[in-house]
Structure formats: structure tokens, C-alpha cells
Amino acid sequence: MAMGLMCGRRELLRLLQSGRRVHSVAGPSQWLGKPLTTRLLFPAAPCCCRPHYLFLAASGPRSLSTSAISFAEVQVQAPPVVAATPSPTAVPEVASGETADVVQTAAEQSFAELGLGSYTPVGLIQNLLEFMHVDLGLPWWGAIAACTVFARCLIFPLIVTGQREAARIHNHLPEIQKFSSRIREAKLAGDHIEYYKASSEMALYQKKHGIKLYKPLILPVTQAPIFISFFIALREMANLPVPSLQTGGLWWFQDLTVSDPIYILPLAVTATMWAVLELGAETGVQSSDLQWMRNVIRMMPLITLPITMHFPTAVFMYWLSSNLFSLVQVSCLRIPAVRTVLKIPQRVVHDLDKLPPREGFLESFKKGWKNAEMTRQLREREQRMRNQLELAARGPLRQTFTHNPLLQPGKDNPPNIPSSSSKPKSKYPWHDTLG
């Protein structure tokens, strides 16, 4: 027996040194009632007839001991469970400029947060600009130009109507100018009968040929609210300012919230506006048709330049886009095929002898000033006559002659009628008149 124990002890030490271990962990049924136990099975010495096995139990998480005792404690530790790391998702490659735009768009505040945009005409324009910039991805200068073209396309039917009426007026211009000359001369002469007669004949002539002089002015009257709404919308965005508007420009005008530093845009807008008005792109009436309109047109761009040169660049971007669109539009409407499709009458070339002679700018200005002065004097004279008639209707009759109309010159006075010379002169002679 002692020999078997000695052999078993030597075998235990040999197994512990060589690291040969046999683990038998208690099953789950034993976890509820007993703590986790590690069981070791060691073969006995081979000197015996049959092998003996030593069953060692180690209770508790303690390390095995190599002391002279017959029990070894083994610590059992489960390996930590490491979750599988997911593979990183593929990130699309973006250029540096596009990355900056994406980051700026993501960080940009909406117009509602900035206090812009509403259901007014100005707010609707701001909402349209925001849609084109944020949703469509256009830069601010492109969004302003695209919004301008969209607005001008909406009023294109009015442009065609104005062109039709302008062509009709031009074809009947000699007769219209004759009636206008008769009316003006009758008014200056104070001949009311001739004035109303010429006015009536001119109205009948216009009705017969379907001429309406106010129709060419419908387009400027309609476009004025659109221009004012765009101006206010862009001015509010620049004065706030919208952060992205400060870097949404082009070329030398990167900041759309300030005025043009080298004044190229104001000069370009002035030149294009003069061309638009001179060619009649907005009204359809060329400046050579009406003398007074030509003179006013030539002065307007120069008058507005000192006032508009300090506007924000965003306003000039809209203005320049609108003027360029008008020039392209009038160029297309001069094509005969386009005029035929749109049913615009062809312009008749009149004989210069049938038209009144053209005057220079100074002569026309002096003549207009003289006509205005004469019109004012006639108006004052009519007002004085009206006041005298009203006074005569309310008060007593007043003497309007220097002698007695009852006395005939060259004849003696009747005997029963006393001479007027025998009577003392009254201080108020009109009191003695018949009434």
C-alpha cells in the first residue's frame, strides 16, 4: 500500500512538471447546488497489477500547488468572448471642392431659421432661390440667374401681346400722328369744338383698326412689381446676410452681399438697360417711333447710375441677367419665321415724307417745354373764366362796359330821359345798371 502511494506521488509530480492535465468540469446540473469544481484524473504507478487512478478535487478558484499534500487546486478560467469587428463601410471618394460644398450645405441654416421666406411675393422669391441653391445644388449666382430666366419665361405671353400691338401701332403711325397734331393745335388755340372733333375721329379710327395705345405699356407695368420683389428679396438676403451668399459669387465678385469693388457690373447694367430701352425690347415700340419717348429713354440710364452703383452684387446679378434675357428675346422676335409663328404683324416701312420731321434733342426739349408752358397758361385762363362765371351767378351784376349801352351815339337824349351828365357819378356805377 505504501509502495502504491509513493508511486502515485512521483507520478503526480512528474505530470505537474510536464504540464499534462486532464480537466473534467462539472456539468450544468451541479452549478445550481455546488460551486464549480475541477476534477483531475491521474494514472497510478505502472508497477501494480492494474492501474490505480487518483481522483483529486479542487474547490474554489485557486492555483494548483506542488507541496507534499495529496490535493491540488486548479483554477478554471473561461476564455473571453470577443465580438467580431464589423468591416468598415466603403466611403465614396469626394473631391476637395465638392467636400467643402457638401459640408457647407449641411451646416447651412434654412431661410425659415434666418427669418426669411414667407407667402408674400418677396418671400416666395426667396423660397424659390433657396430651392434652387439647396435642393438643386446651384451656386448662388447660378440660382439668381436661373430664377430670373424662370420669372421672365412666365411673362413671355405678355411680351408677345405687347409686340403685336406695337407692330399694329407702327403700321398706322402716320394717321395717328396726324390726329395727334390736330388735337394738340386745337388745344393750344383754345378751340374746344375742333379739339373734341379731332379726338372723336381718332377714337373711331383706333376702334376700326383695333388699335389700343395702352397695350404696349402692360408689360412694363406688370414687370415693375416683379423687379421690385426681386430687389427687396435680394436686398434682405444681402443685408442679413445669408452666410453662404458671401462666397456664392463668380470671378471678381465672390461676395454677393457687397457692392462691386471695381464698378464693372453697374456699368454693364447701365449699358444693357440703355440697349433694351432703345430697341424697345420691353414695350415693343422702337424709340424712333415716338420722339418724346426716345429722349426720356436716353436720359434714364445715366440718371439711375449714381443711385444704383452701390447696390449689392446680388441685385446687379439679377438685373444683368434680366437685361441680357431681354436682348436675346428681342433678337429672336425680329426673326420673320418667329414672328409668323407668334402671329406678330410685319412692320411696314413708311415713307419719310409722310412722317413729321425729326427734331434734335435740344429742339424737341424746347418745344416740349413751350407746349407745357402754353398748356399751363390756357389752364389758368380757363380757371379764371370759370371763377368769374361762378361769381356772377351768385352775386349782383357787375359793370363790364365803360359807357351806357342805352344811349346811342349822335342822337340827342329824349326829353323825358334825364341826361347822364347831370347826375353825379356814383362810386359804384354797376349799381345803376339794369338787373
Swiss-Prot record:
Relate the assembly described in the record.
Monomer; predominantly monomeric at low salt concentrations. Homooligomer; predominantly homooligomeric at high salt concentrations. Associates with the mitochondrial ribosome. Associates preferentially as a dimer with the large ribosomal subunit 39S of the mitochondrial ribosome. Interacts with OXA1L; promoting cotranslational quality control in mitochondria.
Upper lineage is: Eukaryota, Metazoa, Chordata, Craniata, Vertebrata
Q: Name one GO molecular function term.
A: membrane insertase activity
Q: Which InterPro entries match?
A: YidC/ALB3/OXA1/COX18 (IPR001708), YidC/Oxa/ALB_C (IPR028055)
| Full protein name | Mitochondrial inner membrane protein OXA1L
Residue ranges that the UniProt entry lists as topological domain Mitochondrial intermembrane: 1-113, 161-212, 282-299
Q: Mind telling me which residue stretches traverse the membrane in this protein?
A: 114-134, 140-160, 213-233, 261-281, 300-320
Which coarse location class applies to the principal site listed for this UniProt protein? mitochondrion
A single GO cellular-component term on record: mitochondrial membrane
Q: Which residues carry this modification: Phosphoserine?
A: 364
Q: Name one Pfam family in it.
A: 60KD_IMP
Describe its membrane topology. Multi-pass membrane protein
- Topological region Mitochondrial matrix: 135-139, 234-260, 321-435
Q: Where is this region: Disordered?
A: 400-435
